Swiss-Prot record:
Domain of life: Eukaryota
Descriptive protein name: Rho-related protein racO
Protein species of origin: Dictyostelium discoideum (Social amoeba)
Entry-annotated residues carrying Cysteine methyl ester: 273
A single GO BP: actin filament organization
Family: Belongs to the small GTPase superfamily. Rho family.
Region: Disordered, residue numbers: 199-276
């Protein structure tokens, strides 16, 4: 059975989301500026994790409305929940606004509209923070970069599955990131299937209990009817016994009458003899 995971990337505009997706998809870093990642014309990628083959589809939430204007008010995410298995929430480690918006803007909307979908937080452009990659090794202040520990704290605050960092330029950390996304997304699918199975089982149990209750009620009614019939039979038997007793009494009375008649007859006969 095919295992498919849909990954939706969200985050502020112009921070390198599309470049990250294209670098991972093509395995090449391109300095071309992309407006957005059009996944409609791209085939899903296959990743193999512990002998499990998972197909991942990459989708970018570009944040633009139908007129091509960047949206300034919610909803910022355009996809329906049934089209998403996991969110990849991105910020640039050189852009503190994009970092802060992970909490105040993107996480807020995810929790409001997609509460059951897991989130993986990732800081990109880590090459800018590495001393050897500073432009011409000029003295650039590192303090304005988002540190790794800040990223971890943010992940904990928004209840993300984890925090990761990567560099599109160096192609560093990309494979590990998307392997995690594939695992998290597929785990979410399995959880939803288990919940559906539990729901079906609960319904079946309720129907079974209702049927059993109906059967019990029917059996109780039958038993009550049988008891009533038995009582009626007993009453009839009692009546029959009473009738028999009455008959016996009548017979006894008849016998007494016969005896009296016989005695009277004997007396008459005796008297007759005496007269003669």
């Amino acid at each position: 059975m095919k295992k498919e995971v849909k990954i939706v990337t969200v985050g502020d505009g112009l921070i390198g989301k599309t470049t990250l997706l294209m670098t991972y998809y093509t395995n090449e870093f391109n300095t071309r500026v992309y407006s957005s990642f059009d996944s409609e014309y791209l085939n899903p990628l296959t990743v193999i994790i512990n002998d499990d083959v998972i197909e991942i589809s990459l989708w970018e939430n570009d944040g633009f409305d139908s007129d091509g204007v960047y949206k300034e008010s919610p909803p910022f995410i355009k996809y329906q929940p049934n089209h998403i298995n996991v969110f990849l929430l991105l910020f640039s480690i050189s852009d503190r606004d994009s970092f802060n918006n992970c909490l105040t803007k993107w996480n807020f909307e995810i929790k409001q509209n997609y509460p059951s979908i897991p989130v993986v937080l990732c800081g990109i452009k880590t090459d800018l923070r590495e001393e050897e990659n500073l432009v011409y090794k000029n003295s650039i202040d590192n303090s304005h970069f988002i540190s790794f520990s800040e990223g971890v704290n943010m992940a904990n605050e928004i209840d993300a599955v984890g925090y990761y960092e990567c560099s599109s330029l160096k192609k560093k950390g990309l494979s590990e990131l998307f392997d995690v996304l594939a695992i998290v997304g597929y785990s979410n699918i399995l959880t939803k299937k288990k919940d559906k199975i539990k729901f079906k089982n609960n319904n079946n149990n309720n129907n079974y209990n209702e049927n059993n209750q109906n059967i019990s009620d029917t059996e109780n009614n039958d038993n009550n009817n049988n008891n009533n019939n038995n009582n009626n039979n007993n009453n009839n038997n009692n009546n029959n016994n009473n009738n028999n007793n009455n008959n016996n009494n009548n017979n006894n009375n008849n016998n007494e009458n016969n005896n009296n008649s016989y005695k009277n007859h004997n007396n008459k006969t005796t008297n007759k003899c005496k007269i003669s």
